Amino acid sequence: MKSSVAHMKSSGHNRRETHSSYRRSSSPEDRYTEQERSPRDRGYSDYSRSDYERSRRGYSYDDSMESRSRDREKRRERERDADHRKRSRKSPSPDRSPARGGGQSSPQEEPTWKKKKDELDPLLTRTGGAYIPPAKLRMMQEQITDKSSLAYQRMSWEALKKSINGLINKVNISNISIIIQELLQENIVRGRGLLSRSVLQAQSASPIFTHVYAALVAIINSKFPQIGELILKRLILNFRKGYRRNDKQLCLTASKFVAHLINQNVAHEVLCLEMLTLLLERPTDDSVEVAIGFLKECGLKLTQVSPRGINAIFERLRNILHESEIDKRVQYMIEVMFAVRKDGFKDHPVILEGLDLVEEDDQFTHMLPLEDDYNPEDVLNVFKMDPNFMENEEKYKAIKKEILDEGDSDSNTDQGAGSSEDEEEEDEEEEGEDEEGGQKVTIHDKTEINLVSFRRTIYLAIQSSLDFEECAHKLLKMEFAESQTKELCNMILDCCAQQRTYEKFFGLLAGRFCMLKKEYMESFESIFKEQYDTIHRLETNKLRNVAKMFAHLLYTDSLPWSVLECIKLSEETTTSSSRIFVKIFFQELCEYMGLPKLNARLKDETLQPFFEGLLPRDNPRNTRFAINFFTSIGLGGLTDELREHLKNTPKVIVAQKPEAEQKKPALTSSSSESSSASDSSDSESDSSESSSESSSDASDSSSSSSTQSSTSGITAHSAKGTRKKRQGKARGEEVDKLARGHQALERRREGGREDQRHQEGRTERARSERRRAQNSRDADWRDPLAKHIDDRSHENSHSRVGNGREQGSHREPEDRHGEPKKRRERRDSFSENEKQRSRNQDSDNVRRKDRSKSRERSRRHSGHKGDDARCQNSAERRWEKPGRRPEQSRESKRSQDRRREKSPTTQK
């Protein structure tokens, strides 16, 4: 046992010595080769672990010691082999001693090696050269005078690469505009390969900033489309490479970048649909996950530009969810994707705020399919000497000036470099002129970003307040500009309109602001007029809330009642929306104030000029419309005065006629008299002519006498009229001008009534002519029909002797029972004489009365000469009709008596 322990100690001591010598002699290259050993060579730790486990399992101590000694021997052999390999591989190192290197080198070989080392160019090494301090770099640049030389181009290439990498790594949302300006200062046309590589590397390293890099690429693409195309080509190739290699991370980063480029309109949406189709064609867990991540980023954009395409994609996802055997986690991801689509991608907007920096006209969209062969142009990543280096640099400077408008900055730098004092003064004058011109320029913010933020602030303050007093206090503490006063009032009204039902909170808040300052009250007045003019644009719910809010403001006298001046109630000036607004408005006022108080307010004499449109009195049609409107909405009590006004309108018109007639001279009255007299005479002559056709010679003489008397009256009146006409011609012309307007209005109003009168006159004439023709035919008949006609004539006559008519009517039945003929003839002759006298007297009285009435009417209604004359003519004819019938019956009686006398019965 002791010998074995001594052997173990000696072997352990030898091992430590060899190990320490190995550690001392190992260089970094030796360690590198040691790391590259196979796992079999590094397996001694595993062997020791197995030995330990064996000892724990109960193996004998001797067996364990033997196994350990065998392991140590094997380890020593491996170490010897490794040392032998290292010595054979090592090349002679110059900084080693000759003893350590194993060979002796002469001192003459050392300076030749140093010369070779000095001749090596650091820029040609794999890493691009070691770090050069700035002072030494400036020194080297000063030594190079030829800018077209290879060394200068290489140095400028290295500087370009460093600046592009630094700017890309610094970009974010807040400084993207500054980074773009600095980036355009560099020659990105020459370094487009470097720029593409830097952008793709930065995006793959930090995918969370993909939207920022996409906005950067969109801006560069608007100025240099070939750079955007190169980046998109490399992205497509990266995606295809990751898809072939089943590299999910590469596919995720590439697809996310492509999605944001589609949102920025750099890539076409067809590329997106092709990528989704490829990913979902043979679905796996990874491909579905990549497709869902891709769809979340550009789903809203696809919904806008290609709804049919995105519907097909979601239909495919639904089939995968129901049919394919995929992991539970992926199934949940698909369900979440459908929920995101249902919410409208609200957490995944197309372009984030602050990154929409390219105008639509400047955007350039690349149509690059997924399956085409593209050249990544990796040569652009490596330095290559340009024979036209200076010319290309000058061209890019011109492009840079055009993009950045650097003419002014270049002139300022030239002045600072050293120019004459005269040139400085001229430049200062030009700058002063530019400043003066700049003061005149007004910039209009079409995006209205400030307005949107202001409205958002007001909305949040309103929604976070418990009562209107707290809200008013918050809004007043904001201290906004006076120009935004109306916008504040508009926002209060909009918030009120957006509510599902009217809340008194907004009415109290608006009333508080109106009480605080006159400017708020004036703003709400103008808003009321604008809202009423554009009320047809609001929905019914919003319209109701707006009407109730303004009703509250008028009830509390926060707004003056003069705002109702803009309401014009008529059939032409109102729409369905405006009538609904007025209805809700006045019903709400009636609930607040009560009908008596509201009626008293509307009858206020000081406010009547403002209520002329609301309660119109200018036109009976509008008045009737207003009455019907307020009655239909249950507020008929407000229209009592309007109803009285509508009833009194004809009386007022009649009362205004004498006043107009008094102003007229005697000319108009005389002319009206003559016209009325002539009309009456015409009517009489017509009646006499009609009677002469059906009567005998006696009736012809009476009608001719009446005609002569009427014509004599006509000539007398016409003579008087001509004399008065000559006297008052000068005065009549002036009054006629004043009366014409009034006459035209009255004629229009009474046109309908006169038409009815004319129609009645025509029907009456037709009836009289029928009766005349019937009487003329009935004259040849015997006793029964003659008696019946005689009875009718007695009933219709207007005589003072009524007993004779009664006797005649009572005698008819006696004649039927056989009364003697002689008595009947005597009674008939007596009654006929009495009837004749009474008829003549009645006709004379009627004619006198008609003439007096016609004169009075002509004086009162001078403006209606022709119309009144027609009415009088028809009236005279009505009065004359009873007179005609007795005359006709009288003639028929006489003819009957003659026949009886000539008959043989009477002779006997």
Curated annotation (Swiss-Prot):
Residues 720-729, 848-863 have a biased composition (Basic residues). Disulfide bonds: none annotated. Transmembrane segments: none annotated. Residues 161-344 form the MIF4G domain. The modification Phosphoserine is found at residues 38, 60, 106, 829. It comes from the Eukaryota. InterPro entries: ARM-type_fold (IPR016024), CWC22_splicing_factor (IPR050781), Initiation_fac_eIF4g_MI (IPR003891), MIF4G-like_typ-3 (IPR003890). Keywords: mRNA processing, mRNA splicing, Nucleus, Phosphoprotein, Spliceosome. GO terms for molecular function: RNA binding. This is Pre-mRNA-splicing factor CWC22 homolog. Residues 1-127, 403-442, 652-908 are annotated as: Disordered. One of its GO terms (biological process) is mRNA splicing, via spliceosome. Pfam families: MA3 (PF02847), MIF4G (PF02854). Required for pre-mRNA splicing as component of the spliceosome. As a component of the minor spliceosome, involved in the splicing of U12-type introns in pre-mRNAs. Promotes exon-junction complex (EJC) assembly. Hinders EIF4A3 from non-specifically binding RNA and escorts it to the splicing machinery to promote EJC assembly on mature mRNAs. Through its role in EJC assembly, required for nonsense-mediated mRNA decay. Residues 669-680, 688-712 have a biased composition (Low complexity). Belongs to the CWC22 family. Residues 14-84, 111-120, 730-798, 807-818, 826-847, 864-908 have a biased composition (Basic and acidic residues). SMART domains: MA3, MIF4G.
